[in-house]
Amino acid sequence: NRTAGRRSGRASQRLGKRAEEAVRLALQAAGFRMIERVATPWTVTFHRGRPKAAFPTAKVSGDFRAVEPGTGRSVLVEVKCRSGRLRWSDLRPHQRQALDEHHRLGGISILAWVTGWEVRLLRWPVEEFGPGKTLKSSAP
């Protein structure tokens, strides 16, 4: 059962990998350095010696970490891949909390929104984006 506008399974994973690579390149073009993907820890269960299931063990603070040259400030990036609109509810509570806390502690928090047409690096907190709000893509 798919939610409207969202992909599932392998197609979603392929799209996510392409989006993450586009974000990495956009961060590099914006001048950030030491850009690293944050690895999600996984747990694998076995049945009779064979893998049965895999699931994320813990929530991570974001999708990428980087450093701002010149200042050495920490950069935390959360990536969202949505066409047309990005809803506040597309961000999970722990993702919003991590972006908020990182910003509050003096780091640079970025919401990277990937549409089919563009990568937008939005500085957190994003103006006029909050509970019940939606951002609209500038792409046609």
Language-model-derived ranges and their functions:
Residues N1-P56:
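Acidic-basic catalytic patches of nuclease active cores, encompassing PD-(D/E)XK
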Residues E20, V60, R92-Q95:
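Amphipathic coiled-coil/heptad-repeat helices and related helical stalk/stem segments
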Residues P56-T57, G70:
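Short basic alpha-helical hairpin corresponding to helix-turn-helix/winged-helix-like nucleic-acid-binding
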Residues K59-S61, G107:
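Short, surface-exposed coil-to-beta transition loops
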Residues G62-G84:
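Conserved catalytic cores of phosphodiester-cleaving nucleases, focusing on short active-site segments
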Residues R82-H102:
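Mg2+/Mn2+-dependent nuclease catalytic core
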Residues D100-F129:
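Nucleic-acid nuclease catalytic cores
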Residues P125-P140:
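Short, electropositive alpha-helical surface patch
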